[in-house]
Amino acid sequence: MRRRSSLVLLACAVFFTALSPLMRWYAFPRLAKIPPGQYQDMVLEARPATLLNYGTMKAERVPKVTIVQTLKGDVAASDRIERSAGRDIVVWDALSYVAGPDGKMVSAIPERYLFDAHSQEPVHATGEMVDGDPVRREGIEFKWPFLTERRDYTYFDAQTRTSAPIHYKGTRTFRGLEVYYFEQTIPWTRVALPKKMPVKGITPQSVAKMGTTRWYTTKRMFWVEPVTGAPVNGQEIHKEELRGGDLLPGGGKVTAFAGHVKMRADYVDSTVALVTSQRTLVLLLTRYLPWGFLLLGAVLLALSLYLEARGRRPAPTAARPPAPEAAAGGGAAGGGAAGGGAAGGGAAGGGP
């Protein structure tokens, strides 16, 4: 019975030990992915900011500028592209909506971003665009890969429509989470005017005819939770200018927008809470279950060997009872005792 139990435990030990690396290196890469129908929004603010007044064509100091970013998954488009690509694809329709202190639109730039649901690598297909212009992304945007590494990545900049390195600058603690801090600086670059302008009658084409161009620079900062690859905080030191042409008095330059853009505090709180819960699920597949299965396999193996050793130990032999003494020998011994008594009597009698 012990030998049979030992074999069962040994089989279980082998199973759980083999399951440990399979969970980490086979199951995790296939199970961890971005859902295609995900929706999320984020509000960022620059307080205070500099904003161009298109009525006077002069830059003005304003109390705040609000930027609302939304990401919405297009499930139908994902399914259609998956059938031809043969892998899990996510299609995000993003919108960056900038509003002045009065709530009126300053700009609205849509994007369509396609990427691999598991690795976050960009996928190139029809419909990939920024503000209606076809683009071909290289590197990441919005999110880092699961199990982010301490290294530089290539990050896509939607304003310039180009990719550039975003540099790993160290490990920090943010709201109780260990995060990786990344920075990217885009130098002054000529960029396209938004298709939607804040003043009726002014279009990118009419501005271009006047010879006026738009220039942009930014310092981009992200605090990324490395297990999920999700940014828990983001900031930009952002500046835009209009330069030259007949639109500006004297053909000089004017600040169109400048400010230190930060995530609003309530959105930071909700993002940290969401990422913390998702982090637990990823750790379950990459750390808790693999190490738990490995430890369980070791315990079962030790128990199996213990039962096997006990099963092979020889059973103790029963003690044999002593052989009974012969009856004749007992009578002679009794006679000797009687004779001793007589000798004692003789000694007593010899006293007087």
What residue spans do the PLM features occupy?
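N-terminal short leaders/motifs
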Residues: 115-130, 178-189, 254
